[in-house]
Amino acid sequence: MTPADPADARAFATATSAFGLDVWRALRARGETGNLAISPASLSTALAMTYGGARGETATAMQRTLHLATDPDATMPAAGALVRAWNAPRETYTLAVANRLFAEDSYAFRDAYLAATRDHFGAEAERLDFVSAAEASRAHINEWVSSQTRERIRELLPSGSIDPLTRLVLVNAVYFHGRWQHEFDRARTEDLPFFANGGEASVAVPTMHARGGRYGEDEGVQILELPYTGDELAMMIVLPRERDGLAAVEETLDATRVEQWAGRVTERHDVDVRLPRFRIETGSLALRTELEGLGMAIAFSDRADLSGMSADGAQALAISDVYHRVFVEVNEEGTEAAAATGVVVAVRSMPANPPPSFHADHPFLFFLRDTRSGAILFAGRVVDPR
């Protein structure tokens, strides 16, 4: 197995965040206005496995869209190094990143590609009969995703997503469960007003209370970072100063801005924190349109070149769609989050005194980050915690 250059692994972490927030903006342009969550880590890992088999103009387009600094052969070990770091056993929290290839039994794949995805991503190739048992294959893949995410993601691939033309499904599943370094006192949780959707009318939601955290301010926002036990991962919450200010903050949202916010926070023992409990569970998002708009339309077309996957003489391949689904729950003890991404490939047819208050009583953003690499594992928007 080719070892990863540490600089390439760091670059892949940066690319993960940049690409994920591109997808975020594309979903916002689609008209997704309610609660929303995505996993940049899951999306980038699944598409990095796909990019490993891309060649020619398709590889160039995917490299640009995914913000990758390296060619397919160098990206596979770089992404794999990050996946292995996330999967390293820990006593303080659970972070599991699982990958698998589900391949059509009759199709001839390139041995070198299957070996690379196995060695770098831990993605074993399982043969299924898409041609005559498409629906049973879909159910089997969904069961695998469910088991990898502790049953939080039950139906990644919707009905009709697998058909007799399907040749390969590349799946990534991410599961996280962590406890706050300083837990909220459940006895202090009380129903308080939350101005859902930034409007004038409020709804009563269970709101957690704490004192202390990593706090900062930037133009138009307050920032709170809550570390998880082990202090390797943290949730950063970005609260617009204006009750209806979320849209303006999202207009300028990109990876550079997130890093800027992260650099603003410092430890404060006096900040008064009020944060609603929340749970977000997205439906299965089909992302083909968004990814085409971001610059990789060729990968979905009859001009796609995924010949790095297929054996010589095998029928040409193209991506048919990319499916993504996320679950995030935040409470007094900590956070549970899960995400899954499936790529379906088919044959072509600093504050002043007094002590600051961080009262999240209106819509806000959150980012679950790997504070070592800076990679965004999960990103979300809460407009109504109910």
Language model region names:
Residues 13-19, 143:
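Acidic-glycine-rich active-site phosphate/pyrophosphate-binding loop
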Residues 20, 220-223, 325, 361-365:
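Short glycine-rich loop/turn motifs
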Residues 1-15:
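N-terminal low-complexity, Pro/Thr/Ser-rich intrinsically disordered segments
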Residues 17-28:
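Extracellular/luminal recognition modules and glycoprotein regions
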Residues 37-55, 59, 225, 354-386:
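Feature captures eukaryotic membrane-trafficking machinery centered on endolysosomal pathways
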Residues 26-37, 41-95:
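Post-signal peptide N-terminal segment of secreted/secretory-pathway proteins
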